[in-house]
Design a protein with these regions (language model features):
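DUTPase catalytic domain/fold
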Residues: 1-147
């Protein structure tokens, strides 16, 4: 299934999200900047993309992830871990970046800074319960299943 995601360029320099390879799970998002943006170590910035999108409906979510190369090579990550964009959002896609390295990193205008993944999503009906079904794991949390 290939859902149709409408986009609107809010800035003429915006780059339409593209999949880098035929098997790519996410499309690249590019920075729309007037000048290069240097992030000092531990500095955060909201990087504009110049794009707004319309998802096909409430059964769809857009997830924004860091690009693995920027994270591993330069320590540039999403400040919020993963961006979650609901189907009713119509504003600009902006990428909250943080530089976790010990060196400054400069984002260039037009640079690919994040990945946009479109996925199905359910809205759950939350129901109170006095008891929950027992499982082998039970209440075991962080690290409880071993290395």
């Amino acid at each position: 299934m290939n859902p149709i995601v409408k986009y609107k360029k809010l800035d003429a320099r915006a780059v339409v999200p593209q999949y880098a390879t035929p098997g790519a799970a996410a499309a690249d998002l590019c920075a729309v900047l007037d000048t290069p943006l240097t992030l000092a170590p531990m500095q955060r910035a909201l990087v504009p993309t110049g794009l707004a999108i319309e998802l096909p409906g409430p059964a769809c979510v857009a997830l924004v992830y860091a690009r693995s190369g920027l994270s591993i090579k330069h320590g540039l990550c999403m400040a919020n871990g993963v961006g979650v964009i609901g189907s009713d959002y119509r504003g600009e896609l902006r990428v909250p970046m943080v530089n976790l390295s010990n060196e400054p990193y400069t984002i260039q205008p037009g640079e690919r800074v994040a990945q946009l993944c479109i996925a199905p999503v359910w809205q759950a009906a939350f129901t109170p319960a006095d008891e929950l079904t027992d499982t082998a794991r039970g209440a075991g949390g962080f690290g409880s299943t071993g290395k």
